[in-house]
Amino acid sequence: MKWTLAAVAAGCVASAALAQHGPIARARQVTASYTFDLVPSPDGRSAVLIRIVGGREQLFTMNMDGSGERQITREDADHEDPVWSPDGRRIAFVLVKDGRKVVTLINPDGTGAEAVTPANHSAIHPSFTPDGRAILYCTDDDLRPPEKNESEIYSIDLASKKVTTLISGGVNTFPVMSPDARKIAYRKIIGDMNSEVFVANADGSNPQNLTRHWTFEGWPAWSPDGKTIAYAGNRGNAGYQIFLMDADGGNPRLVAATEGRGTSPKWAPDGKTIFFTVCRESQERRGCDIMAAAL
């Protein structure tokens, strides 16, 4: 099926949750069902996304006009959290198979699969450093019942395979490094009913809570210029929506008003569009679609 990653018109929907400055984008659905987690390539010409095929999460690539869609994974396993290398030559993702989660690299055509993370780590949420030499990830070993109390953030050097612990203590997920490689944004879960977007130095020092809100907030994504962070939150009792804030946590504002659970914001390379996933009804991924909001 061919579809277009269309721009969206700006709306003027008021938000009681935040002091809103400027219009809120009225997001438009840009894919059919059974798709989620679209990530534009660094050159903005193509994208990788996840589609449900035969009950499994498989990776596809395509041109940004929706043409040339191609399935690049076929293993009887789930393939999650895709992300492009900065040079666009590799795609990292999480291979979920036989109870293990391994960050894996492949070429954009699906060849050259290479496991990256060590066997003793159940690894999730990979992201590349801006120079492409390392991958950040976190572990979910202790996120399963009955523990649910520990998730550390690591970096792994792709040449030496040296693993460095960056952030520990509590549940820390979704790490992503700023374009200037000086900061790491991530989600930290605080208690049973709260998570926040934090930023720390690149070595994990000096963590700062940017969102400071009693609800759930997470899925941070740096803008290409590093001045803004997109994130998802459920402020205002309206389900998860997509927000922006300045890189220091100031000026939080709702950017996309949607029906359903909006998460996983991803920036277009030109910084003019945010793609994200919206799941409806049961919140199962079979009910998920990819949306776009023009800024």
Locations of regions flagged by a protein language model:
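C-terminal segment of classical bacterial N-terminal signal peptides
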Residues: V13-A19
